[in-house]
Amino acid sequence: RGLEPDRGWINLMFVRKANRRQGIAKMMVEEIEHRLCALGVKRITLAAYSPNYFFPGIDVEGYPEAIFFFEHMGYEGIESSYSMSKDLHDYHMPETWISKKEEAEKTGFRFGSFEGKDALEILEFAKNEFGGGWKRNLLMAMRVGEAEDVVTVVKYQDHIVGFAMRKIDGNVMRFGPIGVGRKFRDAGIGGILFEMKQQEMCSKGIYHLFFVSTDDPGRRFYE
């Protein structure tokens, strides 16, 4: 279990190929369900325990038998998840995004690196807007003294309204999460943060960016 008392996860499960179709997987899942139920869990998610998952979900193309198995066990597919990557060699922020950033700044937005004084506010912001997992990502970066280097924030009227970060699992190339408060979405702020993060990574000699999970709207945004 994580920060949600009524939610549990099955992060990883394998059965040796030679021992499949003997009911082993069924027994393991039933045992896990029994233990989680005893702890008060009301729903179980497969794999997607951010940020410490091996996979963001079951690979539909790679493991069709696993899909069939879990559907037979009563599990339902809820949403699709995509892994994506980008080459950052010779990256330069496009002029259109530079102009958008300047226009946003004229209306009161301020972009910059995380500072220690932002700690309590950004943790509360992340929890309220996106959930405990995002708060944990930030907290871990603070604990190892890397938040100033890996977190970019955007403020409006001196209050944090969005942020982007990287390296949540120790890999300098891993991007995310990135998010903007509900009141300020659809204003291009997320796009500005993403472009800034790419520019920052390239300037630090990090020439490859990847993330392991996003949904359909996220995929359209990054494409």
Where are these regions (language model features)?
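Active-site-proximal cofactor/substrate-binding loop regions of enzyme domains
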Residues: 1-20
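A conserved beta-strand-loop-helix scaffold within acyl/acetyltransferase catalytic domains
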Residues: 1-7, 130-182
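Conserved hydrophobic beta-strand within the GNAT/NAT acetyltransferase core sheet
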Residues: 10, 44-46, 175, 209-213
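Conserved acetyl-CoA-binding loop-helix of GNAT-fold acetyltransferases
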Residues: 15, 21-37, 180, 186-199
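Acyl-donor-binding surface of acyltransferase catalytic domains
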Residues: 30-105
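A short beta-loop-alpha structural element at the N-terminal edge
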Residues: 109-122
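A conserved mid-domain beta-alpha-beta active-site/ligand-binding segment of alpha/beta enzyme cores
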Residues: 123-127
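Short glycine/proline-centered loop/turn elements that form peptide/ligand docking sites
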Residues: 194, 215-218
